[in-house]
Design a protein with these regions (language model features):
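Active-site anion-handling motifs in enzyme catalytic cores
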Residues: 1-304
Length: 304
């Protein structure tokens, strides 16, 4: 079976680069192709399924004239291809990516997505709030399910960083978790007073995190910096930590998956704030089961 996954991997964001690894592990018997917003000249003509996800790809940062955003138009390319070719398609382990301080405008911001969300064969999302909002704007009552993010299924055998005998605080910058935030500085000072080693680690693209890491190094030349760890190294670093401060969604996921205490700010992005921290991370397997059911439907149709 040939499946095209459309996400945001390949740009250096550790969380987005984790999804292909999870899907490759879970669907070893299938031929998997991965695409993102660098659109191909054409899509393969022999696809059996088109999957949008994982990640927070359901968003529309509208322009000043309220026209669909470039991101939406890129995703539209793939959805239109699936519809025109009659290829079954849907969303897997996705999230709504609402703009800061615009939560109440989600109906307007997500309007271009509505006809596509209504037509998708399956939709799995990573928070109960996402389910409610999709049902609100589409009117559909079935085919939309919540499971914890698929990245909870990620495992690696990468060696842990060498232990220096001191507890370790790992800081994953984004948003207010940054070197110049006064509250963050205060928390780091408290950790140092308890003899914690402080490590700053990027989990975003270099264009997003480079300045934060440079500033952390300027403020404290002795601090350890991890610039481009990749999923395996990031997972191992977080697993070796006593505590994690993170502004990145997958910094929280990697910590929670390994039972590492973590802190996120009250002003965290929508996807972090909406995470159901009571849900069992093992329930992320629901995304896999949903896609397996879609694959079985395709195979049954082919047999007929």
């Amino acid at each position: 079976m040939k499946i095209a996954f459309v996400g945001a991997s390949g740009y250096g964001n550790v969380g987005d680069d984790t999804y292909p690894l999870v899907f490759q592990e879970q669907f070893r018997g299938a031929e998997l192709l991965f695409f993102n917003s660098d659109l191909p000249a054409e899509m393969p003509s022999d696809l059996d399924l088109v999957v949008l996800g994982g990640g927070g790809i359901i968003y529309n940062s509208a322009t000043h004239d309220e026209s669909p955003s470039p991101h939406f138009r890129c995703m539209q390319f793939y959805m239109d291809h699936a519809i025109a070719s009659g290829t079954p398609w849907g969303f897997l382990s996705c999230g709504l990516q609402l703009r800061a301080r615009r939560d109440e405008y989600f109906r307007t911001d997500l309007a271009p997505w509505v006809p596509y969300l209504q037509q998708a064969d399956f939709i799995t999302v990573r928070s109960p709030e996402c389910v409610q909002k999709i049902q609100d704007i589409t009117g559909r009552k079935d085919g939309v399910s919540f499971f914890p993010d698929a990245a909870y299924l990620y495992r690696t055998h990468a060696p842990a960083p060498p232990a220096g005998g001191r507890p370790m605080l790992t800081v994953v910058p984004a948003g207010v978790i940054n070197p110049h935030n006064q509250h963050n500085q205060h928390m780091v000072r408290l950790a140092r007073s308890l003899d914690y080693e402080v490590v700053w680690m990027s989990m975003g693209a270099p264009v997003d995190d480079g300045t934060h890491l440079d500033n952390a190094q300027l403020l404290d030349p002795t601090v350890r910096i991890i610039r481009r760890p990749g999923p395996a190294a990031a997972y191992a670093q977080i697993g070796a930590s006593r505590l994690v401060f993170t502004g990145r969604y997958h910094g929280m996921i990697f910590a929670r998956a390994q039972g590492i205490p973590f802190y996120v700010s009250e002003d965290a992005p929508y996807k972090i704030r909406m995470e159901d921290l009571q849900a069992d991370p093992a329930d992320a397997q629901g995304h896999v089961e949903t896609l397996k059911a879609a694959m079985e439907r395709v195979q049954s149709g082919a047999k007929k």
